[in-house]
Amino acid sequence: MADLLLQLSRVAHERNGRRLLDGVGLSLRAGEAAALVGANGAGKTTLLRAAAGLLHAATGEITATGLDPRTAPPAAAARRRLYAEQHPSCAWDQTVAELGALADRPAAWADWAERFALTALAERPLASLSGGERQTAHLARLFASLEEPYGALLLLDEPTAALDRARRETVHAAVHAWAQAGAAVLVATHDAAWARTFPRVVALEEGRLIADGPPAAAFTAELVRAVWGAPAT
């Protein structure tokens, strides 16, 4: 059986008296890719942040790449557990090339910069980029830092929300290729068409897990109304 790379059991989190996660449980093994869907405020970002170890107050069992990310030193899984925020913070005067250098893998960065059509933007400060270009630069830096797909856990929060079609397709291909190479990938997305391409769909509603299975089973009429408010295509 493939390695268990993410295990959540009875995970809960509150903020200002509001329950953001309510007893969520799920697991991901090497080679699995799952789409995480839900309406705004359903708890998708909170779940990804908990799995990434950024919510130290979250309760329940959280194991990511064999460690509890709430207590493990950040360096312990720096290149095996990768988290992409939807709106990453950045130094606005930093150039695209300087951001890429943080991956500390020049050849890999050059490859991803080319794939994402960032090469011509290398000397541009992040502040001068469009939202989509900035998101792409952060994704390229993150992807370049992945040394070995097998055994890695990728947690991606709306990675294609601001991207153009060509860059979206690059992300789509990379995500599925990594899963095939043995990574575990959990992707929060509002893109119903992309979510349907995943072998597994996990759905949240008001912090609770309401569906977990293949798209044909998870995409019920109730889920589609709750998340998209209309038939999802």
Give the role of each language-model region.
Residues 152-158:
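Catalytic Walker B motif of ABC-type/P-loop ATPase nucleotide-binding domains
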Residues 68-82:
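ABC ATPase NBD coupling module
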Residues 52:
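Helix-to-loop junction immediately C-terminal to a conserved catalytic motif
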